[in-house]
Structure formats: structure tokens, C-alpha cells
Swiss-Prot record:
Region (Linker): 345-488
SMART domains the UniProt entry points to: AAA (SM00382), ClpB_D2-small (SM01086)
Region annotation C-terminal: where it falls in the sequence: 717-809
Protein name: Chaperone protein ClpB
Subunit structure: Homohexamer. The oligomerization is ATP-dependent.
Residue segments, region Repeat 2: 80-144
Cell compartment(s), UniProt: Cytoplasm
Gene this protein is translated from: clpB
């Protein structure tokens, strides 16, 4: 059977009739199942007609069961009976007679009545409803009668029946407003007033709402529909119907050439004749190219004449980008629409909107939303969710927080789960006892089952009562938790563990980075400021430039910070600036310009920060990059934002930016004196720092340096630091060996010798790594290959009499 012309509700009726057949255990779908489907659908004209005749689902089900009984589960695929097929064919014929281009629930009911001999007809007669009376009721609801049925819906009627094609393709916003299905529209009175002004013009009376996604363009059209229902519009717009047309629905199912144009022409003719329709086309840019196959004209060109003459009142809605990309290119279409800018609401307006919607979300989630939660949703979404717009993102926060709180409160208690498990076990044991014919045991288990079932029912009812009495509350903390889940930025209140970790951050960092207290303190203070909520919200958490000779821990401190913040040292965004030495390579940071290879891939820096807005950004060896790179970084350091090649603004306000550089390393090498008294060392460090800063000023522009929070000069490593660093490096080696079930330890003398061998003030800690490779790793690899070391063995390395490294027995 062909269901192409059947409306969504009509198709739902047929699906429900199949469900009824399965429920009753019947192998075929008969007229009685279609009747049950019509009543169960509940919203169509047929359901309303049957309800007005006093027919309820339970009554019809009872009568059907009485007439044909209940079977077992159907054993084969379910098919329509010949009578049911005839009803479907007659419904199409009824639609044709009434001049409707669609088949709705009312036509199915008319077909059912016309067939007149099936089980459905008997059910209706038994319930005291004559078929003729049922038919008259349907036609009355359709705004028609028997004498009008053959006239194919004349234009004189101002009812819904005069626009059958439009009704099948569009949704009536005024009906939704009347039924209270539209959310209240708050703070858009200026935009609605401007829309009314444009609609009241003689020609070109077509407003188009332009604004960013999520600012409330569709809400303006819904607000107009609500005002029409409340009679708060001028006389010119009284009794108008606002119909929202989805171009996808208009195009859907148009298989043959000319079908789309015919459908659209019918819609336009119906609108012209009805005279009381305001068409709302959301995503207006979909008009361009819609239905425009090879040689055919698209929807926008079909609508242009009517739009210009004022025969068609149309409200459009589209985003700024799509308006520019599609509508502005077609000047003839653009001049027929009057643009109305819908701006993003302010924080105060967003709070008003959320307060207006609060009742709807409280009723849906069965929770109470506090004033603090409303304010937090507006302020936190504005601050942390930067790629979307108010009020949409704030509403989404409230919605998800409500969902989260409700699900949390509806978690089944453990004692209830335990009772359900016990009941299942007893039921299985009883079935097993019956199978093995142990009837006494089965009787005893049946009593236990009954007892458990009663206990379960009582416990479940008590839990449900308790749930119904106490409404869960959506608090500021719940909103903050959702923001953290979305963005990865921790905005919830500090826990005791986190507070302790932040206060002891220096100690944690000192365990990884030896001998650089100034750098560690500066970074720790920046993180504490941010987490306590005292940092400047318009700038990054902190921006640092680490200077010093090679191998003193500049990059290591960035890794350690990432581990403290995210429990993973690889969680930082690392950009090796030596890759950006050529001028043309700088575009890779923000993405290639249009027309170049890699435009669709996005920037290497911007894309990573968009995905992880709360992160440590390490720009390693920054002096190796081309000077143009620093121009890109200016607005990142000052305003915490950067625009990528596609025009998207990337938010850097929740990042820690660390740049490392070897500028002035030669000065450090020349001016490092060992063995002076403490006072002299401090004075020496200050002199050396000032010289390095001078070198830095020569290498970088003042506007770049002026935007950096702190410039930190790392100390050269002292001999006393070496043992601690060797211990750290050996711990890393121990971790690698542990994976092979080997346990390594070194004697103090062995550690001391590595520290002495690897000490070089000019090269920092890296020579120690080479010393460990040469003396420890090479020795272990030889012993492993020789088979002298077995798995699960404790391996101790020390020195022999000649001072050589050996594996001790």
C-alpha cells in the first residue's frame, strides 16, 4: 500500500493499529485495530470526533475483546485484512472528494464509516454510535458538511479547511500559543513591534530576523503568535494565523519533475485566498536552491513575485553569516525583505528571560531552581562558554542542571535493588522446583515470592512518596558542575583536597623542578589567583617568559604544572617555535588563509585551545620563531583572545601561557661565579638578571614584553642540586624497569659519582641523563641479555674498588 500522501498523524494511527494487533495477539490488522489506533492517537480530528461522541479507548478495547477475543502472540508477520485495505483506499477517495491533497486521520475515519461492514462498524453500533452521526461529526469538525463535500474547498471559508496543503506542510504557531505550548517570550517587545510595523506595510511587508544562533529569532515569531492570541496587536493583524513552514517538508517526497513547484504553488494559492496567513520560514536561506533541480527554478524565485506585491506576508529568520552568504548575493530577493537585527541580550535581560522560563523547567524536571542558580547560569555561561550566545547557552545550562539533579534524586536505593534481586532468585528457584516436580518446595517458594513481592511494593511506594514530597533543588553548584563538564574549566567551589593541593603547590612543583624557587613561586601564585576567582577575567591566568641556560628546568616546570593541574604532564598544549622560523609558517598557528592548502584543518594553536580552553600553553624556544609570530601573540597576552582563519574568536582567558627562551644564555654563562658568599651570590644574580633583560629587550619588541606578566630568569644549577636531580631521573628509570618486573636501587656512592660526572654549569641537567644512560642503562641491558638478571629480581648498582659501576650481588 502507498502511504506517501498520509500525514504524520495518519501514519501514526496505522502504526498504533499494528501495536494494538500485537497487544491483542492477532495475526492481522483489521478495521477494529484501525479504530483503536484512531482513538489512541488522541490529537487528530478523528480522535476529537470520537471523543466528542463519548468513545474512550478502554470502552472500545473492551468491546473488541468481547467480539473477537484475545489471541496468543502473533506467530508470523502482521498483514492488513482485505477490509482494512479497503478502508485505506476509501480514505484516499474521501480526501479526493473533499479536495484535500493529503490523507489525514479524519479521512481514515470517514473511510472506516463508509466501509460500514467490518468489526469496527459493529463496535460503534454496539456502543450506541450510528455511522451517519459519526460521519456528520467529522465533517462538522472539518468545517464542512455533506453538501460542501464535493465542492473541493471553496475559498470563501476562513477555516483551516481552506488551507489543506499548508496545514499538512506547516505548523500553526497561533494554535500552539492558544494551547499554551509556547514558552513565554521576554524582553523582545522592540523586535516584535518592528515586525508588526513591517507586516502592516502595503507592499514588501516581509520582515527578516537576523541575528547570531541562539539569540531568540524564532522566539520573536512565537511572541507575535502569542500577541495575536492575546489580542495585543493592531486591527490589521487580528485573527491572523502564523504558520511556520519547513522547506525540508515541502521538498520531501517530490520524486518527479514539477511536483515541488506544484506543491509550493498550491501553498501560495491557499495563502492568497485565505488572506489571514502570515508565513514564518525559519532558516530562510533554505529557500535558495530548494527544489531547484536541473532546469527547474528554486523556491526563492517562485516566491519573489508574491513577496514583492504584498500577496504573501512572510517572516524569515536566519543568521548573519547565512544572510550574507545566500540572501545578499541575490539582490532581487534581498530587497523584498526588511532586515530586523536581533541582538544578543545583556546579562540582566538573560536573567529576566530565565526567570520567565523557570516555571516550565521546574515543572518538566520536577525540581526547584534557586535565584542563585539563575544568576550563575547567566554569568558563568557568558564567561566560560564563549563560542555560543545568550540566552540559548544559559537556558541549556539550566536545562541540563535540572536533568542532572532529577536523575541524581531518582537513583534507586540499594535496599530496593536488593529486594528485586532476591525476588528474581526466588522466582527462578520456584520455576526450577516446578520443572523437577518438587511441588512442596515450589509451594514454599511461592509463599516467599509473595512475601518479597509485597515487601518490594511497600518499599517502592514509600520511596516514591518520599520522592514526591521533597523537590530537589538546582543550586549554583549544580550549574558550575555542568559548566565544568562542558568546558573542562574548574568553576565549582574548592574542595578541601583541592585547597590543600593549591596551598602546597610550591612543594609539589619543587619535587619535580630543583633549584628554581622564583619560577615555581610565580607560577603557583598565578594558579591560586585564578582558582580563587581573583584573576582579571579578560586576561589569561598568567603569561610568563622563562629565561636561562639550557637544561635548567624551563620546559620541565611547564610539564610539572600540567601534571599538578590535570594529573597528566602531557595535557599541556606544546608548540615548538623552532617550526615557525619562516614568515609563511606563522599562518599555521591560526590556520591557512582561504584558498591555501590546509584551510579546512584550522590552526595548530587555535584548534587545540578551542578543544581544551583550560590548559597550559607552552611556546618552547620562542626566540627561534619569526618576529611576525609575536604580532599574533599580542592580543592573546593582553585580551586573552585570538581570531582564527575562519573568523572564530578563540578564548585564551583560561590558559597559562609559558614561553621559554635561551636569550642571554651567554651572559648567564659569563657571569656565573661559584663559591661566593650568599650576599655576593644574590648581588651577582641581580646583575646577571638585569643584563639578560637587556638582551631580551634587544630580541623582542617593547609592546610584546610589556604584555607579559612576569619574566623569570632561571638560576644555573649548583653542584648540590645534582644529587636531587639524579634521584628524580633514577625514579623514572625505576618506573620503566618495573614494567619488566625488575626493582632497581643505587648506592649513595653511585648516585654521587653520576652527579659529579654529569655536572656541567653550562649544560645544566641534560649531561646527567647521558651519564645515567652510559653507566646504568648500558650496564643493565648487557646483564639482561646475558641472563644474569632474572624477572622479579632486586637489582642493586654500586661501585667496585676501581670506581666502576657494577651490579652488586
Amino acid at each position: 500500500m502507498m502511504f506517501g500522501r498520509f500525514t504524520e498523524r495518519a501514519q501514526k494511527v496505522l502504526a498504533l493499529s499494528q501495536e494494538e494487533a500485537v497487544r491483542l495477539g492477532h495475526n492481522n490488522i483489521g478495521t477494529e485495530h484501525i479504530l483503536l489506533g484512531l482513538v489512541r492517537e488522541g490529537e487528530g480530528i478523528a480522535a476529537k470526533a470520537l471523543q466528542s461522541l463519548g468513545l474512550e479507548v478502554s470502552k472500545i478495547q473492551e468491546e473488541v475483546e468481547k467480539l473477537i477475543g484475545v489471541g496468543k502472540q502473533p506467530t508470523q508477520s502482521i498483514h492488513y485484512t482485505p477490509r482494512a485495505k479497503k478502508v485505506v483506499e476509501l480514505s484516499q477517495d474521501e480526501a479526493r472528494k473533499l479536495g484535500h491533497s493529503y490523507v489525514g486521520t479524519e479521512h481514515i475515519l470517514l473511510g472506516l464509516i463508509r466501509e460500514g461492514e467490518g468489526v469496527a462498524a459493529r463496535v460503534l453500533n454496539n456502543l450506541g454510535v450510528s455511522l451517519n452521526k459519526a460521519r456528520q461529526q467529522v465533517l462538522q469538525l472539518l468545517g464542512s458538511n455533506e453538501s460542501q463535500a464535493g465542492r473541493q474547498g471553496r475559498s470563501g471559508q476562513q477555516s483551516n479547511a481552506s488551507t489543506p496543503t499548508l496545514d499538512s506542510l506547516a505548523r500553526d504557531l497561533t494554535v500552539s500559543a492558544k494551547e499554551g505550548k509556547i514558552d513565554p517570550v521576554i524582553g523582545r517587545s522592540k523586535e516584535i513591534e518592528r515586525v508588526i510595523q513591517v507586516l502592516s506595510r502595503r507592499t514588501k511587508n516581509n520582515p527578516v530576523l537576523i541575528g547570531e544562533p541562539g539569540v531568540g529569532k524564532t522566539a520573536v515569531a512565537e511572541g507575535l503568535a502569542q500577541q495575536i492570541i492575546d489580542n495585543e496587536v493592531p486591527e490589521t493583524l487580528r485573527d491572523k494565523r502564523v504558520m511556520t513552514l519547513d522547506m525540508g517538508t515541502v521538498v520531501a517526497g517530490t520524486k518527479y519533475r514539477g511536483e515541488f513547484e506544484d506543491r509550493l504553488k498550491k501553498v501560495m494559492e491557499e495563502i492568497r485566498q485565505a488572506g489571514n496567513i502570515i508565513l514564518f520560514i525559519d532558516e530562510l536561506h533554505t529557500l535558495i536552491g530548494a527544489g531547484g533541480a536541473e532546469g527547474a527554478i528554486d523556491a526563492s524565485n517562485i516566491l519573489k513575485p508574491s513577496l514583492a506585491r504584498g500577496e504573501l506576508q512572510c517572516i524569515g529568520a536566519t543568521t548573519l553569516d547565512e544572510y550574507r552568504k545566500y540572501i545578499e548575493k541575490d539582490a532581487a530577493l534581498e530587497r523584498r525583505f526588511q532586515p530586523i537585527q536581533v541582538d544578543e541580550p545583556t546579562l540582566e535581560e538573560t536573567i529576566q528571560i530565565l526567570n520567565g522560563l523557570r516555571d516550565r523547567y521546574e515543572a518538566h524536571h520536577r525540581v526547584t531552581i534557586t535565584d542563585e542558580a539563575i544568576e550563575a547560569a547567566a554569568s558563568l555561561s557568558d564567561r566560560y562558554i564563549t563560542d555560543r550566545f545568550l540566552p540559548d547557552k544559559a537556558i541549556d545550562l539550566i536545562d541540563e542542571a535540572g536533568s542532572k539533579v532529577r536523575l541524581r534524586s531518582y537513583t534507586v536505593p540499594p535496599n530496593l535493588k536488593e529486594l528485586e534481586q532476591k525476588l528474581d532468585e526466588v522466582r527462578k528457584e520456584k520455576d526450577a522446583a516446578v520443572q523437577s516436580q518438587e511441588f512442596e518446595k515450589a509451594a514454599s517458594l511461592r509463599d516467599s515470592e509473595q512475601r518479597f513481592r509485597e515487601e518490594l511494593e511497600t518499599t517502592k511506594n514509600q520511596w516514591k512518596e518520599k520522592q514526591g514530597q521533597t523537590d530537589s533543588e538546582v543550586t549554583m553548584e549544580d550549574i558550575a558542575a555542568v559548566v565544568s563538564t562542558w568546558t573542562g574549566v574548574p568553576v565549582s567551589k574548592l574542595t578541601k583536597d583541592e585547597t590543600d593541593r593549591l596551598l602546597n603547590m610550591e612543594k609539589i612543583l619543587h619535587d619535580r623542578v630543583i633549584g628554581q624557587s622564583e619560577a615555581v613561586n610565580a607560577v603557583a601564585k598565578a594558579i591560586r589567583r585564578a582558582r580563587a576567582g581573583l584573576k582579571d577575567p579578560k586576561r589569561p591566568i598568567g603569561s610568563f617568559i622563562f629565561l636561562g641556560p639550557t637544561g635548567v628546568g624551563k620546559t620541565e616546570l611547564a610539564r610539572a604544572l600540567a601534571e599538578v593541574m590535570f594529573a597528566d604532564e602531557d595535557a599541556m598544549i606544546r608548540i615548538d617555535m623552532s617550526e615557525y622560523m619562516e614568515r609563511h609558517a606563522t599562518s599555521r598557528l591560526v590556520g591557512s588563509p582561504p584558498g591555501y592548502v590546509g584551510y579546512d584543518e584550522g590552526g595548530q594553536l587555535t584548534e587545540k585551545v578551542r578543544r581544551k580552553p583550560y590548559s597550559v600553553v607552552l611556546l618552547d624556544e620562542v626566540e627561534k620563531a619569526h618576529p611576525e609570530v609575536f604580532n599574533i601573540l599580542l592580543q592573546v597576552l593582553e585580551d586573552g583572545r585570538l581570531t582564527d582563519s575562519k573568523g572564530r574568536v578563540v578564548d585564551f582567558r583560561n590558559t597559562v601561557i609559558i614561553m621559554t627562551s635561551n636569550v642571554g644564555a651567554s651572559e648567564l654563562k659569563r657571569n656565573k661565579y661559584v663559591g661566593f658568599a650568599l650576599d655576593n651570590e644574590e648581588k651577582d644574580y641581580k646583575d646577571m638578571k638585569s643584563k639578560v633583560i637587556e638582551e631580551l629587550k634587544k630580541a623582542f619588541r617593547p609592546e610584546f614584553l610589556n604584555r607579559i606578566d612576569e619574566t623569570i630568569v632561571f638560576h644555573s644549577l649548583e653542584k648540590e642540586h645534582m644529587k636531587d636531580i639524579v634521584t628524580l631521573m633514577v625514579q623514572q628509570l625505576q618506573k620503566r624497569l618495573k614494567e619488566q618486573d625488575l626493582h632497581l636501587s643505587l648506592t649513595d656512592k653511585a648516585i654521587e659519582k653520576i652527579a659529579n660526572e654529569g655536572f656541567d654549569p653550562e649544560y645544566g641537567a641534560r649531561p646527567l641523563r647521558r651519564s645515567i644512560q652510559k653507566n646504568i642503562e648500558d650496564l643493565l641491558s648487557e646483564e639482561l641479555l646475558r641472563g644474569a638478571i632474572e624477572k622479579e629480581q632486586q637489582v642493586k648498582i654500586g661501585l667496585n674498588n676501581k670506581g666502576e659501576f657494577i651490579v652488586l650481588p
